[in-house]
Amino acid sequence: MKVLNAVRGGFAAALLLALVSALPGTAHAASLEVKIGNFTFGPQKITVKVGDTVTWINEDDIPHTIVSTGKFRSKALDTEDKYSFTFTTAGTYEYFCGLHPHMQGSIVVETATGSAATQ
């Protein structure tokens, strides 16, 4: 009888854990990467969800920065340096390299329902 009760208790705990894991809002935020190389950002445009983190990685042999006027600004990134930013507000974020302004990119941040607000 004790064994049967232990099995029932284990089954109930596993079922409860499965149900809680399936609830909305338990999804984990994503991490995405943008590579910097040959004076370009790649990919140049990405779409993420609110709460996602984007990490820029400088694979070039010269320094670069990531600047979104009024939103975020990295220090000068040497080769293999990284800069991460977590997006908490939906919208479109245009950015560029402060040292080489012709290098440009954009991040579209959508809400969980898939819409992007205007920044």
Located regions from the model:
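Extracytoplasmic copper-binding redox domains, predominantly the cupredoxin/blue-copper superfamily
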Residues: 2-10, 18-119
